[in-house]
Amino acid sequence: MTRYAMTVTPHSSLFIGGYAHAHGESDGDTARDATSMLIPGSALKGALREAAFRLVNAAGCGHETLRDLFGEAEEEGALRIGPLRPVEDAPDLSLRHHVSLQRATRQAADQRLFQNRVTAAGYGLRFRGELTTSRPLSEDEQGLLESARQLTDQLGGGRGRGLGLVSIDLEQIPVPPFEKGGLGGISSEPGTIVLTLTAEEPLQLGIVKDLSNVATSKGYLDGSAVRGAVAAALERLGHHDALDVVLGGDHPAQFGDAHPGHLSAVPAPLTLREPKAGGAPSDDAVALCAHAAGGRPSSRRHGYRAAKGSFALDGGGWQEVTIERRMVTRTARNLVDGRAADGLLFSLEVIEPHGLCFYVPVTGRPEQLEWVVQAAGADLFVGGTRSRGFGRLRLADVLTESPLASLAERHQRWIDCLKTLDAQRPETTGALLAVGPIAVDQARLLRAFERHDLELIHGVSRRQAHGGWNRKKRLPREVGSCFVPGSTFIVQHRNGESALDALAAIEAEGIGPGRPDGWGRLIACHPIHVDCFKENQG
């Protein structure tokens, strides 16, 4: 992978639409986010591609080099450009008036006056970002990129009105070599580390898209997405043998789902409810278990609703993790010439990167963990529209200690809570919280518990389809669905013995397929059940 520092110097005002919400005093604002104005990587990459397209058409050759650099339909190119931000403090936006043109006559339309807020000209404004290549560029590719850089002198909208005059500079950034085996803190035995990944760019973590022109984003990072990003990073770095070490064999490295906000963040258990008027959440897992184990019944609280999203342990207790989202507008590309297609707009919901951290648990052998850390150190790119400046994650830290107490301590706290409700033999019970999808049906789930002499005595779970193939192939729901993260299963040992060993085995092994991608992961007696337990006698 090669990195370039890219600097864009405007010589006139800039207006890049479709990214920022319009100000109350204008019809449209140039691209900006919660921090500052910016140049989206997609806008700059589109301008470079347009210049390169003119060059290869004029020369009559080089179309293959153009495709390798900028990509084509369903194939990602070698170049990606992140958002560019001002180097110095930028002045306030200035208001600029313009009229709309009639498409038929190309004349000014009557009574169609617009006001846009654009960057101020003449203040020495500069934008800086990073251009990366997924592989070393050939001599022809470097020549085409350099020629396109020199030819690109306009950017954004209103170029026919004198806006968007720019100059672009590129400077290669040296990448320090990685010394394998020099990572401290990783045990010599198989274990688990937690990668702390900070978002450097907006994220579009898509779900199965509906038929509309709006693509929404979920609020957490799949283990499969991180696993794929690690594989792509190892390939960029040229460590092809490491792919088999990390991802192949009988015991590949396992990547868990990453929730934002805090190291303790987990998907909201389906037993967790929050007051409609606001306040601390309440969890029903202990009460449900006590009722099933012969304890005192607890009536249902009123004025509560099911909690959703991710929850993390804050100083004042368990709180919902809030992330900032925004909608951006994008245009589809014409496959013939690569230019924006007329009338084909779509909206993307993205997650703002500022202050956003993901904590990714990775389990494997020491050699696997070292390769994973090396790949993460070269930046990971996840989610959709990565080539348009979305999805870059930077490794901030590697944690080797679990945020959870030992299972023995968690199980003892669970027992102590059940005793307050007069539950019979509380040591034989436990709760299993799914922190990843569980891809088994009800019968296979019960058999998995039976192998450890456990039986399901209660639970709150939900199943959902996990792919677009279900509708296309008309698969039965029990085949193409899974238990969603947050499903809670309350179990009891069938022989009247302590459930501690059985819970430990399930927590270590998981249930069902897909463990390398974060599927099948469960946590026994999670602290959120006890911390949010509120006794209610009705």
What are these regions (language model features)?
Residues 1-538:
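Conserved active-site/ligand-binding neighborhood in enzyme cores
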